[in-house]
């Protein structure tokens, strides 16, 4: 299963291809992605972050083995071949334990890496850029690289122990600002300089040599950089190729390396394609997919209100709002302003903090109620046209069934299609 190494080889040979990484644990998002990859006969890269999934359960309650089982079971149910499925771990390092002393945080990070690799994750992003409780701020490149090399050694040993060979593919480096969208309002963003990228690479190369890991350097397939793309609650900073041209040219001097771009959500299709052409050939997408899921659910809730007596409605939007107000920990430090501004952000922000609430049992019950209400009888075409106009065109042409579930899946796939097109290459 060398899909990623082969993709990099083809890209370096001039194909201008890439791959997108689906960064979500939501079952409908994953179903949409698996079905889309199946229809287009492409490999599918699905990633879990160190916040979502860890040896203690993360915020999803899943360990890496649980997540793999969940994804593989879904793939099997949709007849998607497991050898076309690539699982990745994102920002693996002491991220979850920055409030602990470095020694303790890195011991946890060792176990995190072991749990991901033992579970069969093959794309491993080593990220030790964050300062722990007793660390200087910021860390030097050398300290970051030494810690990453330590984790790489753990990963290699674990992989050989469980699978008989070390066939992992690595990503190193990190972007600024922090993962998951910026907290503040953005207007300008610093692109990683070629010198900074080279310094990161050389520090890691030196640290890997000290750990006796020279042989794995060709399996370090990507460096995470900031090409100048980001989003906040209501704005998107679009990719400007001219600002990243020196960075783009710099990676051409490395035979087996491309760039990985995070926070590519909400970029235009043209920008996504240009990112891949400019060697930012692994595109991470997460919030844009759950944002699209949320759009579809809000549209279906509006249709439900037109069709179903008020007392029989699911009340999905009100349930969602009530739960978010009752448990504000996932949005309170992100959304600011007066009451109305925060209300709008809870429902509509690009940063999509609402994604943390979909697993809640009350919200899930309301979702199931909504789907039942709309599955009982055909949804009138004019209402689909009003609230889901892109899906309406496909319903009218006969390529899409107008059931609640299919409308949701297809709405998410409209975003996936943009990434697929960007990554196809020449």
Swiss-Prot record:
Pathway where it operates: Carbohydrate metabolism; D-tagatose 6-phosphate degradation; D-glyceraldehyde 3-phosphate and glycerone phosphate from D-tagatose 6-phosphate: step 2/2
Pfam families linked: GatZ_KbaZ-like (PF08013)
Highest taxon of the lineage: Bacteria
Cellular component, GO, one term: plasma membrane
UniProt record, GO biological process: carbohydrate metabolic process; D-tagatose 6-phosphate catabolic process; phosphoenolpyruvate-dependent sugar phosphotransferase system
PANTHER family associated with the record: D-TAGATOSE-1,6-BISPHOSPHATE ALDOLASE SUBUNIT KBAZ, N-ACETYLGALACTOSAMINE PERMEASE II COMPONENT-RELATED
Subunit structure: Forms a complex with KbaY.
Function: Component of the tagatose-1,6-bisphosphate aldolase KbaYZ that is required for full activity and stability of the Y subunit. Could have a chaperone-like function for the proper and stable folding of KbaY. When expressed alone, KbaZ does not show any aldolase activity.
UniProt family annotation: Belongs to the GatZ/KbaZ family. KbaZ subfamily.
The name this protein goes by in its record: D-tagatose-1,6-bisphosphate aldolase subunit KbaZ
Source organism per UniProt: Escherichia coli O8 (strain IAI1)
Gene name tied to this protein: kbaZ
